[in-house]
Regions:
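Conserved anion-binding
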Residues: 15, 19-23, 96, 100-180
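Short, acidic/polar
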Residues: 28-40, 87-93, 153-163, 215
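Glycine-rich, proline-tolerant flexible connector loops at the mouths of alpha/beta enzymes
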Residues: 46-67, 107, 173-184
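Charged helix-capping and loop-helix junction motifs
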Residues: 60-70, 153-158, 184-192
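Catalytic cores of alpha/beta
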Residues: 76, 80-102, 189-226
Length: 248
């Protein structure tokens, strides 16, 4: 199972949101480049970077964050997976130009899947990942959310996964919004179901990881990757311990 330590950026600062809510932002007194170097020293080979300003359409902060992505790429040998505010082909190329190894497509893929497929043809399935962020509605149906989780799409999560897998996509980052930043454990059953729906799409679990036991459960169920953010920032465990856990 591939581990992706995460850095969320807002105006160049390392932050975390609670369930994607910008009104519930925690700022960390950590330099993004130094944090990336620390994760590399702990054994990381991938880094997940989210441009929160880009997701909100705030240009000044997005420029600052892009510069930081470029700095991280220069300062480390980490493979960077990054998303947030990717809306056009120029945005995709800009992220690759900054040193990203993989670009995450969120709202644009859900709203205009034919455009996402066009970019897959241009850049290749290995270079792109889908961000499918979902929350269960009152009937227990997981609905995909877009626009920084502010809008609910009509799309049902499992239908989306099956459709994108059939279209030739390879990677998908799936967040259970209700668990994001809650440190309450991941929704293992959800990821197992996603794997059953489409084994071809390699799913990265995001949201809720708070202890090594969570990683053990995901790994035991054959989940291909996991995003770890708040747990590392708040010292619940070290990345080196997490790597050893999934390698055991």
């Amino acid at each position: 199972m591939q581990l992706y330590p995460a850095i969320d950026l807002r105006s160049g600062r390392v932050v975390r949101l609670l369930q994607g809510d910008f009104a519930h932002e925690t700022r960390y007194a950590k330099n993004a480049v130094e944090l990336a170097k620390h994760y590399e020293a702990e054994g990381a080979n991938w880094l997940h970077v989210v441009d929160l300003d880009g997701a909100k359409g705030e240009v000044a902060g997005a420029i600052e964050n892009l510069n930081l992505i470029e700095e991280i790429a220069r300062a480390t040998s980490l493979k960077i997976q990054t998303g947030g505010g990717v809306r056009t082909e120029a945005d995709v190329r800009q992220r690759f130009g900054a040193g990203a190894a993989r670009v995450v497509l969120g709202s644009v893929a859900v709203k205009t899947p034919e455009l996402a497929s066009h970019w897959r043809d241009i850049f290749g399935a290995e270079k792109l990942a889908l961000a499918l962020d979902a929350r269960a509605d009152p009937f227990g149906v997981y609905r995909v959310h877009t626009a920084g989780w502010q809008e609910t799409a009509e799309a049902e999560l499992f239908e989306c996964v099956a459709r994108f897998a059939a279209a030739g996509f390879k990677h998908a980052l799936v967040t259970d919004i209700a668990l994001d930043g809650m440190m309450a454990g991941p929704n293992v059953a959800l990821y197992v179901k996603l794997k059953e729906v489409s084994a071809e799409l390699l799913v990265q679990a995001s949201g809720g990881v708070s202890q090594l036991m969570d990683l053990r459960a995901l790994n035991a169920n054959g989940i291909s990757g996991v995003i770890i953010g708040k747990a590392l920032l708040e010292g619940k465990f070290k990345l080196s311990e997490a790597i050893a856990e999934v390698a055991a």
